[in-house]
Amino acid sequence: MPASDELRSFLARMLGWSDERAVDLALRSLSLALDHRAALVLCGEGDLVPIAWALHRHTLGADRPFIVCDPRRGTKAASVRSPASRASGVAAFEAAIGGSLCVRSRRLPGDFSALVARLRDTDDVLCAICNAEIADPRPPLVLPAPLVVPPLAQRSAELDRIIAEYANDAIEELAAPASGFTPGDHAWVRAHAAASLADIEKATLRLVAIRTSRNLSGAAARLGMAVVSLSRWLGRRKLPPTMLSDHGSHR
């Protein structure tokens, strides 16, 4: 497991800085999951797969496979926006060896029983279960405790800190100057892209890439995505005014 201070900091961002007990329980649950003694259970509103993916990167590392078992999405390669997926449980298990396998409790595969049997017999795959139902908030009597991700609507006092930390991550990842994310960008993310942690992470990274690249093609290349995809993302949003003046032509 990575340095506890780094992981604790990320979990506090995800669960809330004011809830130290939730962070302590999450660290224990992650330890059990990484030792393959239990599945990691995430509970909360919305799509929790991006959070499971982020936890995977912070624990096992981005170079290890992260596979979503999703009969609806089918077999897809990983992209900058989405992790790789497989339609069947067994196929997902085989692709996830050495890494993590993620399943949504409401989209279990037809061969789920076979998947469970495989997981019980291996120490090579970490299993993460995303459950839309909010778990009982009382302290559990047994471990592992689920990681209950509170909605951002309940964390308005922490929203600015969340945005700032994701912006710092983006600046570090892209080796950008601190000026790559401005107070205007921060206000824009707060107003237009703060529905979820995943939205904030995506928006801060893309804004930093756009602001610190010569053109849209350069930003897309640094993000590892197609320029047409980044252009569509921009087309659905009104950018911060200062960015429009600095990047009047995104070609």
Task: Write out the residue ranges for each language-model feature.
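Conserved alpha-helical scaffold flanking the Walker A/P-loop in AAA+ ATPase domains
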Residues: 27-33, 77-119, 168
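Key DNA-contacting residues within the recognition helix of helix-turn-helix
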Residues: 231-232
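Short Lys/Arg-enriched helix C-cap and helix-to-coil transition segments
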Residues: 241-251
